[in-house]
Amino acid sequence: MSITAPTGVTKYNLGKDSVDLLYVGKSYSLNLAMDNIFHSVGSNYNDFTVTVTGVGSVTCGSYSQSGRGAGWSSHSNIVDFNKIAKEFVTCSTSGNTLSINVTKSLYDYYESKETKIVEGNGETTTYTNKLYSINTDSDGNKPYFLVTVKHKTLGFSAQYKFFIGEEVSKVSPSKTTITF
């Protein structure tokens, strides 16, 4: 079995490796190509489980935002990307199709938030374990998502690696002249 990447997807350089780049707010359909040595697979072999894992780590911290400004009070908590990977994507299968829906940007992640009135600042929102940065591992790679599709009874499987980003649809410069 293999997973065919969706059309029109670009590659993202993780560092040492490259993976497909999927965009926030978009859904993707990938073909689960079934094959054997006889090149004949029946239609009853489409009962799969799907798991999403994260490979690598990110740095999170405490971030506060008020009417007087915003800033980090700490950002040294290293979090295993696998613990938060399911916050960003949902995956399912139907027949021989794997569907991936990218629901949230990496930098929108936080574990919890609290809003209260702080003397001198007014209404202040503090985000706990908000994503601060993505880390590079010893192989030179940034974190990525790994989807594993496994047949429930026969046990064969295939994997698909990707990273998520935000698509830019329009750039509007504020000045009409660029000076070098």
Tell what function each PLM region has.
Residues M1, A158-E166:
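C-terminal edge beta-strand
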